[in-house]
Structures are given as structure tokens and as C-alpha cells.
Amino acid sequence: MSHTAPKAQKQSLKPLVALTGATGFIGQYLLRELPKRGYRLRVLLRRPTMLPEGCASAVIGDLAKPYNMAEALSDVDAVIHSAGIASTMSGLPEDDYRLFNTEATVKFARAAERARVKRFVFLSSIRAQSGPTADGVLTEEREPRPTDAYGRSKLAAEQGLADTRLDWVALRLALVYGPGVEGNMARLIKLARSPYPLPIAGLKAEHSLLALDNLVEAVDKVLAVQQPLKRPLIVADPKPLTLGAIIAAMRQGLGRRAALFYVPKPLLKSALRAAGHVDGYEPLFGSLVADPSALAKLNWVPRVETRAGLAALVRK
């Protein structure tokens, strides 16, 4: 375990936060935005790379073997654990998800517990609570029913955190959008950029999304709140959108009309199946709506309205 940059001097009274996953989609954004809010960041890296801009210091170490993390967590006030295997990395065996998303998280949490870290923020997923679609509105009170290896690994990590003495919080993130996004959201951006009218005006299923900036607000809020948390919290933009509304917002950002038309859903499914695309788009036919009311009770105020955020995304 070795530092690649000197420790920040203790003269600053601002919180020192250890961040994992700083090279990922969400981690990079947190690394850029949290220092603007006064946080000092210590980035935990698995291998020696260029020191990311915006961090107070960096430490090299393997999160799957955190027995020697005492130095890395020295003087740390809080941890944001963003590292892990993403849902977009399909085709991996369940053992890989369990190793990197569950076991590494719990071992790291135990190291944080020994280091007397005050708060452990785990970036979980709404998929820890349900499959790609769900009946009704998801709340933290509903029994979790993940349907794939990714979701099961995230839920198991949450359960492992609950067995520690840490003041932890698991942020169950809805589908996140922002610069550099991959996976399903990248597919929707590609659809919106296509020059063709789209036969999705009749799809009424609604989908909860989450702007990166609203996620930063949530992380800031749970780092600052004084009362113990020790629970999962759903993080989603307040108003879900239909697929048509998502595409319309993106095309508005491109300065174009929505260009959507109606095709009966069974016919649309048949056409996608014939083209070999039905599996990739099947989740779009069902709703996944998540309620962030519990987080709002902690005075979380999302800054980005979803339609405006989607319009801005495609302009970048």
C-alpha cells in the first residue's frame, strides 16, 4: 500500500472523503463536483495511474483484500463506495458479481469500521429492489426482489453493511443519465439522434431516471445529514417519463420535433422480435417507477428537471 500523493494537511477542517470507483462514469463526476462543495477527496485506486484531478491524495490498494487499508483510511471522515461491476457488463458469471460487488464491499466496510469512519455511502442500484420492470411504485418499504446477478449482488452488499456497526446508507440509484453514459441510456440517445420517426407514441409505461447532478445533490445530502441513517434510500428524479417523453425531450434538445407515431404494442413487439431486438428493448414495455420521498424528507432538493436534463445531455 503506497501513497502516490502526499496526505492533505490536517489544517483544513473540511471533511475528508475516500472515494472508490473514481475512474467510472459516476465516480468521475463525483470527483469533479464534490470538491466544489468543499470536500477533500482521497481517491482509492486499484493500480498506479495518473492522479485524477481534484483529489487531495490517492492510495493504491486492492479493495478485495482490504486487510491493509488502515493507512488508506487514516483520518477519513466518510467513504463513498462507487467501485464495482456495472449492470452494463452483461455476460459475466454470478460469482464475479458476488466477488466484486458483494464481498469486496463488505470487506471494505469492515476496514472502514476498524478505521472509525463516520459514514459509509454505498452506491447501490434500484435493481437491488426489483427487476427491469415492476408493478406499482417502488419504495424502500417494499420487499426487495432482484431478478439478476447484478441486482442480487447489490442487495447482498446492502445486507452485509447492515451487519456492521457503521453508519451506512445505500443509495438505490434509478437509471442515471449524464455525459459519457453507456448502456440503455446510450441506446435511447442513439434512437433520439436517428433521423427517423419512431413508432412509440402508444407506449404508456413510465421510467424513473436520475440526473448526475441530482445524484451529486443526494450524495452531498447524506454526507452532511447529522442523524444516523443505516438504511437504503431510493434516488430518482421526482417525475417518471414515458419512452416517448424521453425521446421527445432529447429531440427538443437537438432542435427537432418529436416525430413519434402510434403502433399497437403487440405489433411493435412482433416487429422487434423479427428484427432480433426484442430482448434489448423488452424493459421499455414495462414500467419501473421509484419514489424518492424518503430522501426528500432529508431535505434533498434535485436541481435538474428531467426533460431539461435530457435536452441538455444530447447537446453536449
Residue positions per predicted region:
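NAD(P)H-binding glycine-rich loop region in Rossmannoid oxidoreductase-like domains
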Residues: 60-103, 107, 111, 128-129
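Mid/C-terminal beta-alpha module of Rossmann-like enzyme folds, strongest
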Residues: 221-280, 311-314
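Substrate-positioning beta->alpha
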Residues: 181-187, 201-224, 230-234
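Amphipathic terminal alpha-helices
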Residues: 2-3, 16, 304-316
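N-terminal Rossmann NAD(P)H-binding glycine-rich loop of SDR-like oxidoreductase domains
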Residues: 17-37
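Catalytic helix-loop patch of NAD(P)-dependent Rossmann-fold dehydrogenases
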Residues: 99, 132-177, 181, 198-201
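Conserved Rossmann-fold NAD(P)-dependent oxidoreductase catalytic core, especially the SDR/UDP-sugar
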Residues: 106-149
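Conserved C-terminal active-site "lid" loop/helix of NAD(P)H-dependent oxidoreductases
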Residues: 212, 248, 271-302, 307-308, ...
